[in-house]
Amino acid sequence: MQFLHELAEKAVHMKNIRFNMKRAYKIRRDLTEQVEVGEGVTLTFKRGEAKYLKQIENLHLELFRQPLYPWLVWLYRFRAKELISIVVDNNDKVIAYDLFFFQPVEANQKVIHELYVGVEYKYQDKGIGVKLRQYSSKCYDEGYLDGISTLAAFDNIKALRTAQKSGFAITKT
């Protein structure tokens, strides 16, 4: 029985990967921005790349204490440029990331979902999460999408505040 469950789960993940591979193809602009955050420290906001995936996985594990889902890692290996925004420091080290994906059940809607936003601890409370979300919104603003959605727990004030500051409307579902 366990084997059948695992097989069915893998089939669902493959369906998600296939759907996202098609939907994300050439969906965003190639935009790079640089922001001064202190003396000699310049942060670069840019599209993700597969070469940064290991750094993103490690930062995610540090922040959320759980790894990224393996099927997401597989998807981002091929569609990092379309589905990931990152912030790197002067040494090309990832200090923040914004991960996106599409829901197959919403195939008829043009909505991309923000899955995770992570900012390294020493850079938190400096507005980088807000700037990263705003940067991501600009990259996807090509007229193809009807919207970007995000989820945050109602008691997660920090997440709700950064979402609101970056232009998201807060609704309770």
Roles of regions detected by a PLM:
Residues M1-V37:
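Acyl-donor-binding surface of acyltransferase catalytic domains
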Residues Y116-D125, A152-A153:
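A short, internal acetyl-CoA/4′-phosphopantetheine-binding micro-motif in the GNAT/acyltransferase core
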Residues V130, F154-K172:
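Conserved active-site alpha-helix within GNAT-family acetyltransferase domains
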Residues Y140-A153:
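Conserved GNAT acetyl-CoA-binding A-motif
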Residues F45, H60, S85, D98, ...:
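Polar/charged side chains located within well-ordered beta-strands of beta-rich proteins
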Residues Y123, G127-Y135:
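Conserved acetyl-CoA pyrophosphate-binding loop and the N-cap/start of the following alpha-helix
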Residues R28-P70:
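Short amphipathic alpha-helix that is part of the acyltransferase structural core
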Residues L61-N90, V94-V119:
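A conserved beta-strand-loop-helix scaffold within acyl/acetyltransferase catalytic domains
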